[in-house]
UniProtKB/Swiss-Prot annotation:
NCBIfam families: PRK00143.1 (NF001138), trmU (TIGR00420). This is tRNA-specific 2-thiouridylase MnmA. ATP binds at G11, M12, S13, G14, G15, V16, D17, S18, M37, G127. Disulfide bonds join C102-C199. One of its GO terms (biological process) is tRNA wobble position uridine thiolation. PANTHER family: MITOCHONDRIAL TRNA-SPECIFIC 2-THIOURIDYLASE 1 (PTHR11933:SF5), TRNA 5-METHYLAMINOMETHYL-2-THIOURIDYLATE -METHYLTRANSFERASE (PTHR11933). Belongs to the MnmA/TRMU family. Keywords: ATP-binding, Cytoplasm, Disulfide bond, Nucleotide-binding, RNA-binding, Transferase, tRNA processing, tRNA-binding. GO terms for cellular component: cytoplasm. Interacts with TusE. The active site is at C102 (nucleophile), C199 (cysteine persulfide intermediate). It comes from Citrobacter koseri (strain ATCC BAA-895 / CDC 4225-83 / SGSC4696).
Length: 368
């Protein structure tokens, strides 16, 4: 007697990647069902209300593919485990990455548990551009085949056990192929543009959105030489290496080079700026990271040669990683790197394999 097909619950976002993932899994012989997660409660009459449109698109795709679509509300989990932490980080003058937190707490925790326990799933699947491979009996996380779309940076907190229960069908394809499949199938999501903005909160005006939850405190903008040259509307609206939105031009005596944020003095509510994107104050020789997650879940000790990304879409930087203690590591880059930002994630790679990462606690500035 043949075994019954394994059951996969696909996280349907209403986008093209999850739509095509569901179809690919059907082709591979899985019993496929969809799940739409509502993770944010919109205010009534909110103009950015995309959740209803996304749900309608997800439903249309599931109808077309002949699969059931479940819905679940994780808004409370999102608020408690992602959003409150996100606000705390901003309050402390750091720049968090909510997508990483959301993957850790919602998609690969709340969703994974709900799919297994309530829906009887053998696996979950998402439309992430990553791959998995089994090495020495443990599931490893690999970069997506499409280097331009690879999303392993956002999934470094996953352990091998979570990866073993997750399928990533589009990780083996390039984005144009995914769009072509959706077009050939006549899916409503074929030409839908990729979502940007904060995970699940969508493309709302960020400044206005943040201002609802955190009181903005205007303060001085000073240069690295100590001259006051303007006012900022709130430190939380600025991040290291930022050039746009400072509202200052070149100075009378100085060059016309654009200004960049090089530091945030949280205690005194001062934004520090310098001219030129390779200003020494913007460069770091390394970083200290904490809140470490290694995919193989083995504690790290000693030293390691690998590459690191300190933000998404960055070219890999060769580096040496040294364990300081169980909780923290020191990372020294082979060459100085601009705009290393506390609160963001440092993610480590050995070739195609994502090893894990941690949160940047501090950057190690160029010796003056």
């Amino acid at each position: 007697m043949s075994e019954s097909p394994k059951k996969v619950i696909v996280g349907m976002s209403g986008g093209v990647d999850s739509s095509v993932s569901a179809w690919l899994l059907q082709q591979q012989g899985y019993q496929v069902e969809g799940l739409f997660m509502k993770n944010w409660e919109e205010d009534d009459g909110e103009e950015y209300c995309t959740a209803a449109a996304d749900l309608a698109d997800a439903q249309a795709v599931c109808d077309k593919l002949g699969i059931e679509l479940h819905t679940v509300n994780f808004a409370a989990e999102y608020w408690d485990n992602v959003f409150e932490l996100f606000l705390e980080e901003y309050k402390a003058g750091r720049t968090p990455n909510p997508d990483i937190l959301c993957n850790k707490e919602i998609k690969f925790k709340a969703f994974l548990e709900f799919a297994a326990e309530d829906l009887g799933a053998d696996y979950i699947a998402t439309g992430h551009y990553v791959r998995r491979a089994d090495v020495d009996g443990k599931s490893r996380l690999l970069r997506g085949l499409d280097g331009n779309k690879d999303q392993s940076y956002f999934l470094y907190t996953l352990g091998h056990e979570q990866i073993a229960q997750s399928l990533f069908p589009v990780g083996e394809l390039e984005k144009p192929q995914v769009r072509k499949i959706a077009e050939d199938l006549g899916l409503i999501t074929a030409k839908k543009k990729d979502s940007t903005g904060i995970c699940f909160i969508g493309e709302r005006k960020f400044r206005e959105f943040l201002g609802r939850y955190l009181p903005a405190q205007p303060g001085k903008i000073i240069t690295v030489d100590g001259d006051e040259i303007g006012q900022h509307q709130g430190l939380m609206y600025h991040t290291l290496g930022q050039r746009k939105g400072l509202g200052i031009g070149g100075t009378k005596e100085g060059t016309e080079d654009p200004w960049y944020v090089v530091d945030k003095d949280v205690e005194n509510n001062i934004l520090v700026v310098a001219q030129g994107h390779e200003h020494p104050r913007l460069m770091s020789v390394g970083l200290i990271a904490q809140q470490l997650h290694w995919v193989d879940r083995e504690p790290f000790s000693g030293t390691l040669r690998c590459t690191v990304k300190t933000r998404y879409r960055q070219t890999d930087i060769p580096c040496t990683v040294k364990a300081l203690d169980d909780e923290r590591i020191e990372v020294i880059f082979d060459e100085p790197v601009a705009a290393v930002t506390p609160g963001q994630s440092a993610v480590f790679y050995n070739g195609e394999v994502c090893l894990g990462g941690g949160i940047i606690e501090q950057r190690l500035p160029l010796p003056v």
